[in-house]
Amino acid sequence: MNHTHETIIAGRPMKVEFGKLGMLSDAAILMSYGDTVILTNVNASEKPREGIDFFPLSVEYEERLYSVGKIPGGFIKREGKPSEKAILNGRAIDRPLRPLFPKGYRNDVQVVCTVVSVENDNLPEILAINAASMALCLSSIPFTTPVAAVQVGLIGEEFILNPTSKEREESSLQLTVCATKERVMMIEAGGDEIPEDTMINAIKFGFDKCQDIIKFQEEAVSMFGKEKKVPELHKVPEEIEEAVREFAFDMISESMHITDRDERNAAMDEVKAKINEEFEEKYPDNMSDIGEAVYDMQKEVVRHMLLKEGKRPDGRAFDEVRNIGCEVGLLPRTHGTGLFTRGLTQVMTVATLGAISEIQILDGIGEEESKRYMHHYNFPAYSVGEVRPLRGPGRREIGHGALAERALEPLIPSEAEFPYTIRLVSEVLSSNGSTSQASVCGSTLALLDAGVPIKRPAAGIAMGLITSKDLTEEEVLTDIQGLEDFFGDMDFKVAGTEEGITSIQVDTKIKGLSEKVIHDAIYGARKARLMILDKIKECIPAPREEVSKYAPKTSTLQIDPEKIRDVIGAGGKVINKIIADTGVKIDIKEDGLVYVSSAESEGVKEAVKIIEGLTKEVKSGEIYLGKVTKIAQFGAFVEVLPNKEGLVHISKLDNKRVEKVEDIVSVGDEILVKVTEIDSQGRINLSRKDAIKEAEEENKQQ
């Protein structure tokens, strides 16, 4: 049976259809916002998965190019692996939903959001979060807390709910807020140095606007939601929990109070070995339960240490940042390098400058077609002292790379100011918490070292949270290390400059964040960020005055768009000859802006000279140094500009009478000529006699 429900959000219709499509899924809905439509299917396994200690939720965000009326590029002509944007959107759906499933739920759950129609005014990624929550709430899967998502823009001093395509272009803020009725579940933001109080007000605005969508979901559930199944929740048997606690709690507490990371890990390894030795014969089939009990006790100790004892595992104050180290210019042949160290977290970022033609072309459903600034993040196993095969970037690496990219994007100079493609690669050399924000700092150092005139230096910091079980007690921590991230309840990453925030990403393991926590985290991050920026400025106070000698040399020139065909030539003949002769790369925009780049500056100068010659107009009355290309009985043909030839009649070759043209000039001679006329057919008439006369008069005057 087909059910529909509809509401109005920000002046546009939001509609859900349930029961019409995907009849064999637990729940399948078609959710639309304007003309953007998402098909969402959710399913769960009948039984919990055995032998695991985590919740096996998978979220897939599937882009279909037919949704924007495109046929995929390439030979195969069908969608391939998910784009980076699709991976990021899948992560954004997962993060607010995961903490709201029942604790101990071990059934496999899959959420598939397929983008089937896109209207640029209504972003599919925002609708997909709402659709995933709606489908889960309507299904029989034990998910009962609706989550809503909105985007908030900022034009002038006015917040805009779900801005249109045009409004997004004008907006200085791109903020996504996900919330339940009571608390904020997730924040994603990018902005043009947004002040802290403005960002907090924008988050409040987004939270309030989420309530209408939550109400819409609740109405749909009350009208046609399925009855919820009673889940089989995993719980560590009391007997095992008590036995492990009695045997190991004191040892765990003592080990977790060791401030040195390596000593603490060694002590915990010893404790775990003793636990295994004690219980592996008694409970051979429950070793995962024993591991879970140990984890719970470790978390209990850390929570007590922070909330009751007022101590952090490494002895720092709650608002204290670890020791900072900054260095530039490490690698001799790269265009720019930055090494950033914070405690045991260390990231080396390398900047590479390329020609404008090396931009990344994006073949997706978004409005963005290309990128000239990109950031890639690598997290090898050795960064945590482990051994595992090296593979391509996973979802986490792609997410962290995009986060650091967003943090610096508003600070990158325009194409006109700095005609280069910019690629940053952050290599995580050592990881003990907040490598994504360390890569923001490393990126700033690398850009400054590469001579990129960024607007201002940026830095990032990760704030953490520890709460009591009932959420009545909470403490915000500055610069969380690995242990605090692992056992903590929040990862609140903030990057920005002295002027304001450029990016935020917030994940939580609990059922949302209070207004106070958000306020304390944002202002705590500012204090830490300013301290880190001071360290960066001590290392390199401003961008290098010149780019590296190993970076390509570039030049730009503006030509008449009508002359583009003259530079390209028939079948690319002219431009290919320029490239072959000078060894440059040439990129021509539709508005006539030409970028020329090469490893050698001489090649750039030569190519620019040729292009200027090809596009320059011959003007009547001007004097040119031309080259004789052909001789006839009646005169000499002279090339005054590339592909621009005129005739010097025999009577205009010299002041005296000329019997034979060859008596005055030969093919290949360079002579001064004056343009006396350009006739109605575009033919150029030249005079050597007039040019000589003018030159003599100038000499007399001098």
Curated annotation (Swiss-Prot):
EC number: 2.7.7.8
UniProt main location, coarse: cytoplasm
Catalyzed chemical reaction(s): RNA(n+1) + phosphate = RNA(n) + a ribonucleoside 5'-diphosphate
Ranges of residues in domain S1 motif: 621-689
CDD domains assigned: KH-I_PNPase, RNase_PH_PNPase_1, RNase_PH_PNPase_2, S1_PNPase
Keyword Magnesium annotated: yes
GO annotation (BP), single: mRNA catabolic process
Molecular function GO labels: 3'-5'-RNA exonuclease activity; magnesium ion binding; polyribonucleotide nucleotidyltransferase activity; RNA binding
Entry keywords, A to Z: Cytoplasm, Magnesium, Metal-binding, Nucleotidyltransferase, RNA-binding, Transferase
Gene3D superfamilies: GHMP Kinase, N-terminal domain, K Homology domain, type 1, Nucleic acid-binding proteins
Top-level taxonomic group: Bacteria
Domain KH, residue spans: 552-611
Binding site for Mg(2+): 485, 491
UniProt cross-references to PROSITE patterns, sorted A to Z: KH_TYPE_1, S1
Known cofactor(s): Mg(2+)
Location of this chain's protein in the cell: Cytoplasm
Function: Involved in mRNA degradation. Catalyzes the phosphorolysis of single-stranded polyribonucleotides processively in the 3'- to 5'-direction.
Family label: Belongs to the polyribonucleotide nucleotidyltransferase family.
Entries under PANTHER family matching the protein: POLYRIBONUCLEOTIDE NUCLEOTIDYLTRANSFERASE (PTHR11252), POLYRIBONUCLEOTIDE NUCLEOTIDYLTRANSFERASE 1, MITOCHONDRIAL (PTHR11252:SF0)
Protein name listed in UniProt: Polyribonucleotide nucleotidyltransferase
UniProt organism field: Clostridium perfringens (strain SM101 / Type A)
Gene: pnp
